[in-house]
C-alpha cells in the first residue's frame, strides 16, 4: 500500500468527520427551531385556557398528567423572592413554591472581563429554566404553586454552610418548613422538609422535584454540543433524552439514579436518595419540557414532627473536581462521545498536568509531547519507511517508465524491489491509524472541558474559542505543508494535486476549531516534522 494513498484516505476520513460535525450543527438547529415552531402553533389555545388553573402541572403519583406548567407571568412581579449568595452561587428563590427561579454562577462571567455572571436557571421569557419542588397530595400539602413565607429576603454564606428556610402553614395548622442547604465550595443544593403534623390523622406524604425549561435559542455555535435531558439508572446506564422524545419516554421506577437538563459546559441535575426507589418521568407541556422525580411515600403520625429529605440539586459546571463525588455516573454528563474510554484518561492527565504548571496552554503542549513520546517507536518506523520510499522514488519511476503498459509485471517488479530493499510500504499506516482515535478523543475533551472556557494563553483569551486572528490555523497549515514535503511525492499527478490542496483545506477547517485543539495539532505537526527530519538526515548520511 502506497503511503501517500493511505494519507489521502486518512485525510478523506477526517474531512468526512469534520463535515459530519458541521451537518450535526445545522441539523440540530433546524430540528430545535422546528420543535419550537410546531409546539407554539399547536398549543396557543391550550396556553390561554390553562393559565386560569395553576395546579394542573403538579405531578401525579399514579398516572401521567400532560397538563400545562408555566411560570405564572401574570403575578410574578407581585410575589417576593429571597436572594441567596454563596461562594459559588447566587440564587433567587421565589416565595411561590420556594422555586429556584434564577441561578448565577459566581466564578463564570458571561464574557471575559465582564461583571455579569453566567445565568444557568432563569425566569426570562427567552429562557425558561427552573427547579421546582413540592409535596403531595395536592390540597393538603404545599406544592410548587403554594405561597411560602421567609424571615429574610437576603442570605449570604459567611461560614462553611448555610440553611435557608421557608415556612408554609395549612388551615388546620400543619406546619411545613422547606429548607435549602448550601455548603462551601459546592454546587450541590440540598432540599428537605420539616413537617409538624398538628392533626389527629396520620399524614401520608410524597415529595417531588422537577426541572422545567424551554428549548434555548441557538447561538450559532460552530462546534456541536448536546442540549437536552439525561438520566442515569440503577443498572449504571446513562441515557440522553432528546427534547423531541420527552413525551415518548415511559414512566420508570428504580433505586437511586438521577435526571438532568444538560447544555454546553453546564447542567442541572436532580439527585434523590441513592438508597430509595424513585419514579422518573419526562413530558412535554406545550413548549416546555419537564423532568420529574417523585420520591416514595412517607407517613407522619399525629402530633409528630418529621424531616423528609427530598433531593439534592446540582447547579453548576461540568467540572470534574466538583462532580466526581456527587453521585454515581454524574461524570457522564461530560460528553466525550463514543471514545469515552480514551477521552476520560486524556482529560484526567490534562487536569493533572494543569495542577502542576497552572497553564492550560502549556498543559496541552506537554500532553501533546507525552502522546508523541507514547507513539515514538511507531512513528519512527513509519518515518523510516517513508524515508526509504523517498530514496526508492527514482527507481520506482524508472520501473513505471519501463513496465507502465503491463500493470501485472509492474506490480511484480515493484514488490521485488520492496523486498530487496527491505521496505514495507504499509508500515507507515499503523501510527496514523492509531492516532486517529486519540485525535478524535482529544477533540471531544477540548470541546467539553469547561476548564478551558475563557482560559488565556499567549495572545489568546479563550482556548475554547476559535483563534480570532487565525494565527494558529495558519501555522498549522504551514506545518502540514512542510510535513508533506518531507514525504515522497505520489506518482499519480492527480493524487499529487489533491495532497497539495490538503493543507489549505485543513487550514480552512481549523479556522473554526477551538484554539486549544488547533494548538495540539500544530505542536504535534512540529514535533513530527522534527522527528522525521532527524530520521531522514540519519538515513541520508
Curated annotation (Swiss-Prot):
The keyword ATP-binding does not apply. GO terms for biological process: protein insertion into membrane; protein transport. InterPro entries: Membr_insert_YidC, Membr_insert_YidC_N, YidC/ALB3/OXA1/COX18, YidC/Oxa/ALB_C, YidC_ALB_C, YidC_periplasmic_sf. HAMAP family: YidC_type1. Required for the insertion and/or proper folding and/or complex formation of integral membrane proteins into the membrane. Involved in integration of membrane proteins that insert both dependently and independently of the Sec translocase complex, as well as at least some lipoproteins. Aids folding of multispanning membrane proteins. It is found in: Cell inner membrane. The keyword Chaperone applies. Its main location: membrane. This is Membrane protein insertase YidC. One of its GO terms (cellular component) is plasma membrane. Belongs to the OXA1/ALB3/YidC family. Type 1 subfamily.
